[in-house]
Amino acid sequence: RRSKKLLIYYNIDTPLRSHHKFNEHKEVGKVVDKILSGEKIALISDAGTPGISDPGFLAVRTCLENNIEVECLPGATALVPALVNSGIPFERFVFEGFLPVKKGRKTRLEKLTNEDRTMIFYESPHKLLKTLNDFSNSFGADRKISVSREITKIYEETIRGSVEHIINLFTDKIPKGEFVIIV
């Protein structure tokens, strides 16, 4: 989608193959076979860094298991700018990514109630209020958090305050964009 537009813009005509959570187990073997036969492969992501709340880990691990060295280029991931811009101490932090949707969500949050490191979560707009309400119940309505959206894009925004304050803001304003929540 976005990657193809970028490649076209720079006149790069390398063939693209989709690699996503629904096909990565099937595709990873093909990727390894191509590399072992001498082809060069690049794993790119439409938004963020492969393997960070995106498919990619399985491909990297399988390559390493087959003695294929992987070169990782530094690139964008929303968690670092959101963390730095949060105003919350981040000497030690833990990346949680997306919380489980149903099974295991409550258990995961219960385990995190005693976490003393800064926590980083990803969330989609249609689940943001539910997640914030879950945070209020698990971590307390007065807990200071930061919510960033659309990192490095035109409508980038970071809101800081208590969980309760941010819930009130998004109750009146429909959430848009992809979110990074720092707790």
Feature names for model-found ranges:
Residues 19-20, 44, 73-74, 97, ...:
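Small/polar loops that bind or transfer phosphate-bearing groups
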Residues 29, 54, 82-84, 106-110, ...:
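Short, well-ordered secondary-structure micro-motifs
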Residues 1, 18-25, 76, 97-101, ...:
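Short, acidic/turn-prone active-site loops that include or flank metal/cofactor-
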Residues 39-40, 117-118, 122-183:
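A contiguous loop/helix-start segment that scaffolds small-molecule binding in enzyme catalytic cores
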Residues 58-115:
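Class I SAM-dependent methyltransferase SAM-binding "motif I" and its flanking Rossmann-like core
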